[in-house]
Design a protein with these regions (language model features):
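Short, small/polar-rich loop/turn modules that mediate ligand/substrate recognition or access, typified
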Residues: 71, 156-160, 223-225
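Residue(s) in the substrate-gating loop at a strand-loop-helix junction
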Residues: 124
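Active-site loop-to-helix junction immediately N-terminal to the catalytic Tyr of the SDR YXXXK motif
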Residues: 85, 130-138, 150, 177
Length: 237
């Protein structure tokens, strides 16, 4: 199962896992996007799910018979420093990025533990370093990293739990940011985003998905509790 699976990194992960033979469940609140992707992936299931709704999450997982892999990818962003951040926006970010991951993970545990499954959480370099004007977002991604490590400590023999921390990746998430905050200078700001990463470009969703595939595979049996950056060198210096 991939949450936020209808677009961006989530969609790329669904495609990559399906190509490797996984029976994928695309979990997303975006019904049209999830259905469109499912038509590309024979055998893929669609789960329309608001991950912040505890009752809906519990009911959804009660209907699932087996689960080997959970990719917690769903998330939202917010631009603003501490002085520009409203409590309602701060709370909403934590509801989706942190509480949502908690609810899904908790509901999935009765399925993942018997299968000795794997959880991959999609964090961000924003959880590792300060990013200007991303106060709430940095806080939520720091929490994702902490939850990853804690789960790995609690379940060392039964479950593998890892976190991927991407830099800026070329997804609809970035497109929406440019449209909302830089409508009249998109290309200029996109160029700045490229240069923020020493490699000189944005990441590709498929690159994140390939790392997720590795972490879910038997080749990564010795990998748990790890926080892995894939950021074009952003955090190297």
């Amino acid at each position: 199962m991939v949450t936020g699976g209808a677009s961006g990194i989530g969609a790329a992960t669904c495609r990559t896992l399906a190509a490797a033979g996984a029976q994928v469940t695309i979990a997303d609140i975006d019904e049209a996007g999830a259905e469109a992707l499912s038509r590309e992936l024979p055998g893929a299931a669609v789960l329309i799910l608001d991950i912040t709704d505890e009752a809906a999450v519990n009911a959804a997982f009660a209907r699932i018979r087996a689960l080997d892999i959970l990719v917690n990818n769903a998330g939202i962003g917010l631009v603003g420093g501490v002085e520009q951040t409203e409590l309602a926006d701060f709370t909403r970010l934590f509801q989706v990025n942190v509480q949502g991951m908690f609810l899904v993970t908790r509901a999935a545990m009765p399925l993942l533990l018997p299968s000795h499954g794997s959880i991959v959480n999609i964090g961000s370099v924003a959880g590792l370093v300060g990013v200007k004007k991303r106060f709430a977002y940095c806080a939520t991604k720091g929490a994702v990293i902490a939850m990853t490590r804690q789960l790995a400590v609690d379940y060392p023999a039964e479950l593998r739990v890892n976190c991927i921390c991407p830099g800026t990746v070329d997804t609809p998430f970035v497109d929406a940011y440019l449209e909302k905050y830089h409508r009249h200078e998109k290309e200029k700001v996109r160029a700045e985003l490229n240069q923020r990463q020493p490699i000189g470009r944005l990441g590709r969703p498929e690159e994140i998905a390939n790392l997720a595939l590795y972490l879910c595979s038997a080749e990564a049996e010795f990998v748990t509790g790890s926080v892995i950056t894939i950021d074009g060198g952003w955090t190297a210096g």
